[in-house]
A protein has these predicted regions:
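Patatin-like phospholipase
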Residues: 1-17, 25-271
């Protein structure tokens, strides 16, 4: 998607939720679309790896204590370490060091507050149940936004327990406009849910969250100026074998969208 955009339009603002926060962050600190693609090719197995240790803890907890004693199948620490290393190569550590306006949402699971991590300061308005922060480590912000419930453990930050931003801000157009964007293009990835009587625990979790995110997206997209929906067919959250397919699908979908709207290097401010 990013590759199709940079060839045709100027991206002046960028935001991303969950795995989209990885793409948004890498682009905002200067990595090219091809470098972002190579990042996912190289690190996807590490990011999505579910270790034997967590599986053992899950099983032993169920057998011995008759309860679930883990808060996720992946603790998220590997993702945070990888992002820290990748950002350090650009001499970027905290989010306020990023020049391109960037926004990454997460959710405080304890009280439902939406935590918005931004590279530019936004004044907190307490009535809207949002908390803005521009001092967090970039790697920590990405980990928080990617903490998909049940798959990744929640991220602890300043005595808060943060999880995937997609729970409340699947399309973060509000914060992007608060950063200063006049025109927002939102990218929505939709998955075709096919009947399957043999679902494992991961599929049950991911399909449940996907359904929730889909309904939330329908509600939220009205605030975006433009919306591009991309159907990823039956590709699951952890299916890293489909990276090439998704890369090409995103590129062709964006090109078709831009051609349909007759855009060619327009000076626009896009999410």
């Amino acid at each position: 998607v990013i590759l199709g955009m940079v060839k045709n339009i100027n991206i002046d603002y960028i935001s991303g939720t969950s795995s989209g926060s990885i793409v948004a962050t890498l682009y905002s600190i200067g990595y090219s679309p091809s470098e972002i693609y190579n990042f996912f090719k190289h690190y996807s197995k590490d990011i999505t790896h579910i270790g034997f240790k967590n599986i053992f803890k899950l099983i032993s907890g169920l057998l011995l204590k008759h309860k679930i004693i883990i808060d996720g199948l992946n603790d998220g620490k590997k993702l945070e370490k990888i992002m820290y290393k990748i950002c350090a190569k650009k001499d970027i550590y905290t989010i306020d060091q990023i020049n391109l306006p960037l926004l990454i949402p997460s959710v405080n699971i304890e009280n439902g507050e939406t935590y918005i991590f931004t590279s530019k300061k936004i004044r907190n308005v307490y009535q809207d149940n949002y908390v803005y922060d521009n001092s967090i480590l970039v790697s920590k912000a990405v980990r928080a936004s990617c903490s998909f419930p049940g798959i990744y453990s929640p991220c602890h930050y300043q005595n808060k327990i943060l999880v995937d931003g997609g729970i409340r801000e699947n399309i973060p157009w509000k914060g992007t406009k608060k950063l200063g964007a006049n025109t927002v293009l939102s990218i929505i990835f939709e998955r075709t849910l096919e009947p399957d009587p043999f679902l494992d625990i991961l599929e049950i979790i991911t399909k449940s969250i996907n359904l929730l995110s889909h309904e939330l997206s329908l509600y939220e997209q009205s605030g975006s100026d433009y919306v591009l929906k991309i159907n990823t067919l039956n590709t699951s959250l952890l299916d890293i074998s489909k990276i090439d397919f998704l890369y090409n699908l995103g590129y062709s979908s964006m090109n078709n969208f831009l051609e349909k709207n007759n855009w060619n290097k327009k000076l626009c401010k896009f999410e």
